[in-house]
Amino acid sequence: MNSINIAIDGPASSGKSTVAKIIAKNLNYTYLDTGAMYRCATYLALQHGYEAQDVSKILGLLAERPISFGKAEDGSQTVFLGTEEVTLAIRQNDVTNNVSWVSAIPEIREELVNQQRRIAKDGAIIMDGRDIGTVVLPDAELKIFLVASVDERAERRFKENQEKGIESDFETLKSEIAARDYKDSHREVSPLKAAEDAIEFDTTGVSIEGVVTFIQEKAEKIIDMKN
C-alpha cells in the first residue's frame, strides 16, 4: 500500500500532538514529535545556562546527546537525549516558557529540520509542529492547520498539566499561550502560518474523536487515490 506524509500545524495546545498520535496509531504510521525535539534543545540550553548567543555550544550538546524516540510499555512515546530519558523533564514550565527563543535560532531550526526530513524521506510519517507544512515537509500529501480559542487551549493545557502533576494557574496559562502565539507568529525564521494548500480546521468545542475523524477521512481518501 502506498503511504503518504501528513503535516499537522497549529499554535500551542491546539490539539496537534494528541490527534497526530491517535491517527499514527490508527494508520500504523510513525508519529514524529517535532515539538519534543525543540524542547530537548531548550532543556539542554537551560541545563547549561546557555543563551541565544551560545548557539554553537547548544549545537555541540545536540551532537553529543542525540535526540531519539522510544516506546513505553503502554505504547506512549518516550524521548531521550543520549541515554537520558527526558520525556517528563522537557514538559516542565521552564522549558515551555523558553522554547520560543530556542526554536527561533536559525542554526537550531536548520539542524532539527534536516533531522526531521531525513526521518520522513520514506513516507508513512505524521509530524506536528508550527512549520511542518510550510518548511519541513512542503511536499506532504496532506496538510492540516488546527486552530482553537486561547481559552479552550488554556483549558486543555491546564488539564494536561494536572494529569502530569505539574502545578499551574489557569489565568497564567492563558497569558502564556497568548504570548507564545505572538512570538511564534512574529518570529523572523519560519513564523507560524498555514501553508497555502493546508486545510484549516477550528477545533474549539470539537472533541478529539471529531478532529481525528475529520483528518483521518481526508488521509484515507488520498491514500486510496494513490493505490
Swiss-Prot record:
Alphabetized InterPro entries for the sequence: Cytidylate_kin, Cytidylate_kinase_dom, P-loop_NTPase
EC number: 2.7.4.25
One GO molecular-function entry: dCMP kinase activity
GO annotation, cellular component aspect: cytosol
Signal peptide bounds: none
Entry keyword set: ATP-binding, Cytoplasm, Kinase, Nucleotide-binding, Transferase
Catalytic activity: CMP + ATP = CDP + ADP; dCMP + ATP = dCDP + ADP
Positions bound to ATP: G10, P11, A12, S13, S14, G15, K16, S17, T18
CDD domains listed in its UniProt record: CMPK
Coiled coil: none
Compartments where located: Cytoplasm
An example Gene Ontology biological process: pyrimidine nucleotide metabolic process
Top-level EC class as recorded in UniProt: transferase
Family: Belongs to the cytidylate kinase family. Type 1 subfamily.
PANTHER family documented for this protein: CYTIDYLATE KINASE, CYTIDYLATE KINASE/PANTOATE-BETA-ALANINE LIGASE
Protein name as catalogued: Cytidylate kinase
